[in-house]
Amino acid sequence: MTKQIFRKYVLLFLFTCITLVGGCSGRGTNSSSDGNTYDVDAKGIPKFVAVDYIELGKIYRISKFRSSEGHDYSDDFETCRSMKHYFEPKSNVDWSTTKVFSPVKGTVSKIYQEWAGTQIQIKSKEYPAFYFIIFHINLANPLKVGDLVTAGQQLGTHIGSQTMSDIAVGVSTPRGWKLVSYFDVMSDSVFQGYQARGLSSRDVVIISKEARDSDTLTCDGETFTTSGKLENWVILN
């Protein structure tokens, strides 16, 4: 998918959010009302994800955390940056066959019909302040809020070539909603699969807050109006 085509679908996504579902918050799930919080600054980010959410063998490249790809997706502490990861399948793969799994055992906390497929938000059982937000799924079976899912359970497949798969991880902290990189919460055993595809460290797919702040982006609503100078993508071997 070319960058021009991707931008076109981003604009379609934003238009659909505004006109059909009342807007697309860049903060994902706001979980503070249930009382579960986790202080990542004091305790660090736990590496508890033991199952990858997607068929890695079918993925060509991954956008970096805090990139300027897609649209603004930020939290209570940062703004105007994409604090999630896009996973783009290989060009020789039927994107709609790419399997999507629950990365953790938990409960479906929210579910939305998007302009392309279904968005599912999963509240972790082990760390109930952590939420996993997976976009653009073609569900294998109907799901509803409150349903239990197991780690590794196939949720469905990616919707298709009209857009990329993306995943965000949010944490309800004592000071507000915070987005962290999916790579920060995956176990070493899961990350080994990415190392086998050429990633030397988790930092390769994460733009630090300091680096992003030094290469400031501008936004009009959730639309990026500048792209910055930092590389947005990591291509896998």
Residue ranges and their predicted role:
Residues 172-215:
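Short peripheral tails and domain-boundary helices/loops at the edges of structured domains
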Residues 2-11:
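Bacterial N-terminal signal peptides that target proteins for export
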Residues 119-122, 149-173:
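Short hydrophobic beta/alpha edge segments that flank linear recognition/processing sites
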Residues 97, 102-142, 165-168:
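Zn2+-dependent peptidoglycan hydrolase active-site motif and core
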Residues 28-119, 150-151, 201-237:
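Surface-exposed, glycine-biased beta-strand/turn segments
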Residues 20-23:
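C-terminal motif of bacterial Sec signal peptides marking the signal peptidase cleavage site
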